[in-house]
Amino acid sequence: MVDTTKNTKLFTSYGVTTSKTTTPEIAAKLISKAKRPLLVVGTKVLDPELLDRAVKIAQKANIPIAATGSSMPGFVGKDVDAKYINLHQLGFYVTDPNWPGLDGNGTYDTLIVLGHIKYYINQVLSGTKNFSTVKAIAIERNYIQNATMSFGNLSKADHYAALDELIDAL
């Protein structure tokens, strides 16, 4: 079992409230209990190992995917509901309770973020943290302090193992 709750060194400081570290099992429970979760993936998800795990998470939990950056081509031909959106626009839209969502069924209550550059996603989640009730679960390789919950800083192998544990727990 990978301990994803350690090594939470802050590389930047955006505020006084930082995310709580989480385990793959707890993250899986929160994802399963979410009413309207959205898997938000970044360009780093084009790593074949990470892409495979993102697809498995979306399929197993029946979660739509918001493909940001240049990640959309990775989901073409996969059996997932993926739509492209600019990450900064998504961060703006999810703070609006009247936003219809990517599917027209309303806004999302939980964002699961994976495959982003840490300083970029931290800025986007700063807005959602401070201006909405949306929860953000960072299952990234790096600790994301503006998420509601986050894995700690992990090696690549530990990150893959943690994602496998999360998939098994969904």
Curated annotation (Swiss-Prot):
One GO process term, biological-process aspect: methanogenesis, from acetate
UniProt pathway annotation: One-carbon metabolism; methanogenesis from acetate
Keyword Isomerase: no
Gene3D superfamilies documented for this protein: TPP-binding domain
Coiled coil: none
InterPro entries linked: CdhB (IPR003704), DHS-like_NAD/FAD-binding_dom (IPR029035)
Keyword tags: Methanogenesis
Recorded superkingdom: Archaea
Keyword flag Ribonucleoprotein: no
Task of the protein: Part of a complex that catalyzes the reversible cleavage of acetyl-CoA, allowing growth on acetate as sole source of carbon and energy. The alpha-epsilon subcomponent functions as a carbon monoxide dehydrogenase. The precise role of the epsilon subunit is unclear; it may have a stabilizing role within the alpha(2)epsilon(2) component and/or be involved in electron transfer to FAD during a potential FAD-mediated CO oxidation.
NCBIfam families registered for this protein in UniProt: cdhB (TIGR00315)
Quaternary state and interactors: Heterotetramer of two alpha and two epsilon subunits. The ACDS complex is made up of alpha, epsilon, beta, gamma and delta subunits with a probable stoichiometry of (alpha(2)epsilon(2))(4)-beta(8)-(gamma(1)delta(1))(8).
The family this protein is said to belong to: Belongs to the CdhB family.
Protein name, UniProt field: Acetyl-CoA decarbonylase/synthase complex subunit epsilon 2
Gene that encodes it: cdhB2
